[in-house]
């Protein structure tokens, strides 16, 4: 499985160790997103930065849409099926996304693909729904489970 992690809150007043942890996750700005494999190491990092990020398990379709819409190559060029085929053993963005979602591949397997996806703030009337509260009580922070796909779709 793979987690999609999105930064919700800014750096103002953040403890140094948490700021460093988010730096290790490549989440340096608000509305940036990364795809990380599900592991104990990353789970600890997410637990530490839970008051500043939101995350959840992502599907292959959502990963494919994310790479198509917001994925960028070095030089800020959009990603195409030809680029994926040339740099990986996968034939298309959909196949590469399925491998990422299942945990067989990572974003690092395509060297020219930037690891950070620059997202738009959430569209719609609700927006974030409160950036100071946990998702479980109506806010935006912490683990969302599969609901991360809806948020990612609103941010594309």
Residue map of PLM features:
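Core subunits and conserved enzymes of cellular information-processing
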Residues: 1-156
């Amino acid at each position: 499985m793979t987690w999609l992690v999105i930064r919700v809150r800014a750096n103002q007043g953040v403890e140094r160790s948490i700021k460093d942890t988010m730096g290790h996750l490549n989440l340096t700005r608000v509305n940036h997103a990364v795809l990380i494999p599900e592991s104990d190491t990353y789970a600890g990092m997410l637990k530490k930065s839970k008051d500043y990020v939101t995350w959840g398990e992502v599907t292959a379709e959502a990963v494919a849409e994310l790479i198509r819409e917001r994925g960028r190559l070095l030089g800020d060029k959009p990603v195409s099926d030809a680029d994926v085929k040339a740099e990986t053993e996968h034939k298309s963005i959909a196949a590469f996304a399925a491998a990422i979602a299942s945990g067989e591949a990572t974003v690092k397997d395509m060297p020219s693909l930037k690891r950070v996806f620059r997202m738009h703030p959430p569209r719609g009337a609700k927006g974030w729904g409160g950036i100071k509260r946990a998702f479980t009580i109506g806010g935006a922070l912490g683990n969302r489970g599969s609901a991360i796909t809806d948020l990612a779709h609103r941010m594309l």
